[in-house]
Amino acid sequence: MKILVTGGTGFVGSRIVHALRAEERDVRALVRRPEHGAHLAALGAELVAGDVTDPASVAAAATGCTHVVHLVAILTGKPQDFDRVMTQGTRNVIAAAKSAGVERFILMSALGTNATTKDLVPYFGAKFAMEQETVASGLEYTIFRPSFVFGRGGALATFMKQVRYSPVVTVIGSGLQQIQPIWIDDVAEHFVRALDTPAAANKTFEIGGPDIVTWNELYRTIAKVLGKRRALAHIPAGIARTGARATQWIPGAPLSADQVAMIEVGDNVVTNADAVHTFQLPLVPLEDQIRRAA
């Protein structure tokens, strides 16, 4: 088995490569700039320079691979950016996988992606298109839709920084929408298990952590774990969206306009237990996720 990973230098991708190499799986990572993949090479992954928007480089990277883990996505951009990187990029990876005779194609989507939200949030629209391309490809596939992914860094680090240093924590809208955060290494383990699980063939799985909380409860839980007492201040989603548009291009910005829109859409929780039954993996509770990231 030889696994091509796209997006392996990213937040989740790095942990997936780490999990694969921990089992001594043969990993080839497609990277735009090899110097950014030094940490993957140190794990024993093979680095191949290329870009999902360049069909020739993807085809070369896929040659000799039996499985593909496709993770590339962007959170911000213009409609043409989402189409070029996510939709067309997925078409390119699928074409390369088919030419290489890949046995299974594993896609990272997002919880909340469906036929309704695709017209409300550009990110969901691009993820929906990626799913559609995958299902129609003729390849054996597995699609994962994770809820908010928490780890060291990423969104959780932003939330924790706000709680740690600000006496008043701002919450978008009512804060009553529910989420189901999942620890990053639990996400990675789902991808690893999907390589060898016959029951995962041609399935789409929603995955989340063991705890469902509202945004208000999330911030209170973070404060509890950090030993802080914090007041919550709710701001209208429209104001948050305007602020996000103005700052989303700044490195380290807390949220993009699309991420604010995702919160507005409503609850982001798993609606069935298919992944639990299929993979039977232990999942890290929310408070432990926060402790690990602290």
Give a label for each model feature.
Residues 2, 193-255, 269-294:
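Mid/C-terminal beta-alpha module of Rossmann-like enzyme folds, strongest
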Residues 3-23:
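N-terminal Rossmann NAD(P)H-binding glycine-rich loop of SDR-like oxidoreductase domains
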Residues 6, 30, 71-72, 105-111, ...:
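SDR active-site strand-loop-helix element
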Residues 34-92, 96, 111-119:
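NAD(P)H-binding glycine-rich loop region in Rossmannoid oxidoreductase-like domains
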Residues 109, 131-153:
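Conserved beta-loop-beta element that borders a ligand/cofactor-binding pocket
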Residues 119, 147-153, 173-184, 208-211:
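Glycine-rich "substrate-gating" loop/helix at the edge of Rossmann-like oxidoreductase active sites
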Residues 154-156, 174-195, 202-203:
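Substrate-positioning beta->alpha
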Residues 158-184, 224, 229-267:
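Alpha-helical membrane-targeting segments
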